């Protein structure tokens, strides 16, 4: 009995009560399970001192000693039935009876990651205090936010076809649902991926329409100057102002704009902290290195430290954004509908807003 384990032989025995198991056996076992006993002394005979441990109080409830620690657990219950359906119903009835008998604190609901995330559900979680909810953290199932004014520029990136443009469009729809007074400006490509926002947004232009782009920046800068003046004149702190959101479908195409217009965008991206401004810039993952190292607007975008990646692995972005993932997470390919949110020198895997409708 005592030498069996060294030869791969193990014994499992049962007894009706503590006196039904001889001492010679209990003295040579490495583990024991005790179901309901009459009092604490009977538990002690089998598994040692129980002290303040919660004792078994119903059928199937037991104590087990693991690494000198007593654990109270519920064994799997046999459920009668001729088929799976009958056994399922019997198990459900048993679970309901256990729930009715429970007198302790109610268990917390286990959060479950939804299959898809609607624009409206994220709009309901967003607000001037929290910021814009762009998705749900896959571990905590809590909303992940980017706050305009604290973050003034953020990249939305990934390979061709991952849904960058769709993501920008969904965020544009959402911020208007959060506050219809949001000032939403869109700079689009010739593919007109953001055209659906043209009617409800404040201003819309294609990047090839230089005069219209100039007018968009003029409107934004005018609003910023107005806010600065109001704050200067206000006797008390201005608590709330509508967000200023600028969506750029492909910021790399801004290279074709005149230098003075690019300089205006540079000012909007870097000199507007605290004024509710956020510039969301779509850019292909393959263009990041050259854009971030050779272009002033790229330097501005990278220096914000925030990005939402919609494809590839965390490793693909480590040259630009830090993360604290384990090795397996770093090398894991993003599934469709998920992203990595980079911010505050870390990365979080998220389920993206309405991301099942991926576009370009």
Positions of predicted regions on the chain:
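P-loop NTPase catalytic phosphate-binding loop
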Residues: 1-41, 45, 53-54, 117-315, ...
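Conserved P-loop NTPase
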Residues: 38-107, 314-360
């Amino acid at each position: 009995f005592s030498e069996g384990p060294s030869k791969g032989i193990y014994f499992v025995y049962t007894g009706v009560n503590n006196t039904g198991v001889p001492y010679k056996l209990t003295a040579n076992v490495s583990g024991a399970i005790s179901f309901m006993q009459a009092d604490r002394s009977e538990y002690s005979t089998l598994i040692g001192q129980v002290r303040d441990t919660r004792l078994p109080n119903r059928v199937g409830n037991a104590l087990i000693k693991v690494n000198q620690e007593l654990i109270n657990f519920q064994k799997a219950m046999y459920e009668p039935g001729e088929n799976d359906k009958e056994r399922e119903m019997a198990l459900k009835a048993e679970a309901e009876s256990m729930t009715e008998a429970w007198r302790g604190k109610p268990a917390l609901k286990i959060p479950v990651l939804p299959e898809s995330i609607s624009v409206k559900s994220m709009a309901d979680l967003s607000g001037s205090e929290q910021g814009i909810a762009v998705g749900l953290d896959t571990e905590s199932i809590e909303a992940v936010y980017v706050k305009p004014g604290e973050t003034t520029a953020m990249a939305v990136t990934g390979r061709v076809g991952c849904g960058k443009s769709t993501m920008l469009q969904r965020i544009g729809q959402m911020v208007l649902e959060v506050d219809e007074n949001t000032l939403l400006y869109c700079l689009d490509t010739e593919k007109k991926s953001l055209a659906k926002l043209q009617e409800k947004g404040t201003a819309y232009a294609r990047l090839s329409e230089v005069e219209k782009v100039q007018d968009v920046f003029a409107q934004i800068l005018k609003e910023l100057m107005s806010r600065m003046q109001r704050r200067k004149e206000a006797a008390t702190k201005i608590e709330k102002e509508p967000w200023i959101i600028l969506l750029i479908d492909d910021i790399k195409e801004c290279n074709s704009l005149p230098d003075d217009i690019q300089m205006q965008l540079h000012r909007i991206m870097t000199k507007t902290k605290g004024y509710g401004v956020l510039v969301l810039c779509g850019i292909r993952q393959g263009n990041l290195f050259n854009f971030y190292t050779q272009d002033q607007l790229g330097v501005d975008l990278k220096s914000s430290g925030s990005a939402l990646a919609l494809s590839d692995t965390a490793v693909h972005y480590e040259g630009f954004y830090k993360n604290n993932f384990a090795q397996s997470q770093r090398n894991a390919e993003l599934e469709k509908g998920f992203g990595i949110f980079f911010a505050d020198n870390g990365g979080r895997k998220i389920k993206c807003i309405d991301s099942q409708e991926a576009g370009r």
